[in-house]
Amino acid sequence: SDDEDSLGEVGKVGVPIDSLEDMETLFADINLGEVSTSMTINAPATTLLALYVATADNQGIPREKLRGTVQNDILKEYIARGLYVYPPKESIRLTTDLFEWCNINTPKWNTISVSGYHIREAGSTAVEEVALTLANGIFYAEEAVKAGLDIDDFAPRMSFFFGCHNDFFEEIAKFRAARELWYELVNERFNPKNPKSSQLRFHTQTAGVTLTAQQPINNAVRVSYQALS
């Protein structure tokens, strides 16, 4: 984070973590066995999770007690956000390796948050948001199975992230359709034994793209209305 290319980012888009010492400073006096930590991190997800687990190890916290989420969704970086580091093949390998490692070592950890929010913010429709997000989720699942994992080893810990826009009934329908489609796709393609493998667990945030700096009061109404759906 002391690179000159980082100067415009430090302190504005998250906490700069360059070392284990930084991670230990961030979580000083916080018992990692008693909290759930969500990290919006993608290309370096394996590195940041390793630092987090090492911090917990140094606190004496059993790894199986750790709870939280890494976003770890590299495909949407190629599609919408642009913050990728490695080529696609190697990036997907890191994603599925994290699935496998967490299944063995940190079974309460959510290993991915497949993100439609960024796709919607980049200009997609509600339909395109769901289509691309579920397509990405299925691709991750297929690659993990190819790597030797069983669908029930990782799918229960997959999570999703959608945006929430102004069209009240469309957004309600979108969330319901996404749940139903994921259930059908996972059951048809992977035949899981654990019912949690086909349950779409998701987080949503109101849409930044619908807001304007010039209308702060309107923004409050917009996000309140969006949250209702």
Give the label of every model feature segment.
Residues Y183, A207-R222:
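Flexible, glycine/threonine-enriched loop-and-boundary segments that flank and lead into catalytic domains
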Residues E171-R179:
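Extended amphipathic alpha-helical segments enriched in small hydrophobics
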Residues S1, N218-S229:
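Non-catalytic terminal/interface segments that mediate subunit docking, oligomerization
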Residues T47, A177, N219-R222:
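Charged, alpha-helix-enriched surfaces in structured cytosolic catalytic cores
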Residues V186-F190, L228:
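Alpha-helix capping/termination and helix-coil
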Residues Y140-A141, L181, L185:
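Short, well-ordered amphipathic alpha-helical segments that serve as non-catalytic structural scaffolds
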Residues S1-E171, R189-P192, K196-Q205:
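Catalytic alpha/beta active-site cores
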